[in-house]
Swiss-Prot record:
Chief place where the protein resides: cytoplasm
SMART domains in UniProt: PUA (SM00359)
Annotated protein name in UniProt: Glutamate 5-kinase
Catalytic activity line of the entry: L-glutamate + ATP = L-glutamyl 5-phosphate + ADP
Keyword ATP-binding applies: yes
Originating organism: Xanthomonas oryzae pv. oryzae (strain KACC10331 / KXO85)
Gene Ontology molecular function, alphabetical: ATP binding; glutamate 5-kinase activity; RNA binding
Domain PUA: 267-348
Residues that coordinate or bind ATP: K3, T160, D161, T202, G203, G204, M205, R206, T207, K208
Amino acid sequence: MLKVGSSLLAADGGGLSPRFALGLAQFVSANLAAGRELVIVSSGAVAAGRAILPKAVDVGAPIAARQALAALGQAQLIALWQRFFERPVAQVLLTHDDLRNRRRYLNARATLGELLRLGALPVINENDTVSVDELKLGDNDNLAAIVAALVDADALFIATDIDGLYSADPRSNPLARPLDDVPELTPEVLAMAGGSGSNVGTGGMRTKLEAAAKAGAAGIETYLFNGRSGEVVRALAQDRLRGTRIHAARTRIAARKYWLRHAPVEAGAILVDAGAAMALSDKGASLLPGGVVGAEGDFRRGDMVEIRLRDDEGERCLARGVSQYSAVDIRRIARRHSREIENVLGYSYGENVVHRDDLVLL
């Protein structure tokens, strides 16, 4: 899996430039020639659209304007990648809902698997044209990590505009030292993350480390490297790392639990009492309506939501899971016994609000 940010593809005067993309394409070609399958997650559609209508939208404009630029630029982005390869390049656009909904998540995995079987090169981007602001994935670093787990990748390579992770931001601190090997993403390591230094993309070093943590939970190592350096990219094409290696977690969680932990969450939560919290955390139980005290948001049956403990100290997140009932229904059956559900609602989807198989503790 290769993730390429817009700062590596955007030309100084607007639009897309093949300057750095060529070297990255050679890295891709070297891996394909070695018999490896590869998927690209590529930003750059908005930057490409801005060149088509250079005075239309400024950086930081409302989302509808950025969506229009993404629609204009997506074809240009795919054309940029296609020019480097003889094999077909497949455009795959994903949204928050595609990864939050389990059935659509599995369908995306099947589609990507078939594209790879057919010898195509999938190029993935967030579908900025239709994503609404509150449901945007936010950055392609995290998208790349989730997709890396989805396709069961061996490694995630993140091309950036600096040489990897440093002990401090090298642009502002001359004493910053590069970190070649990161065995574990500790709080101290996360504190070293600085900004991207670019107004083109949305992901800084912090998001790259968050992505590495997501990939690591699936047993996938992450490599951060300077995509602007031809020497570094050529070394990578020869399997010689020049950058930062971030090790995978020692314990790989099961695929479904990974999805439950890392899929985008709906803007909502189920609120539970201390008894329910103890049953979930200590006994591995399912969540029953008797332990529910309320619901926040307007989620639907089948949505991924947070499960939060509400007590005298406030609220804190305990778990995530797939709700068997909508927020409206949960407010009606809260504090009720499971056998009362059908009498209250007129129907029942089962005795559990969230089944233990659809729940992961945080």
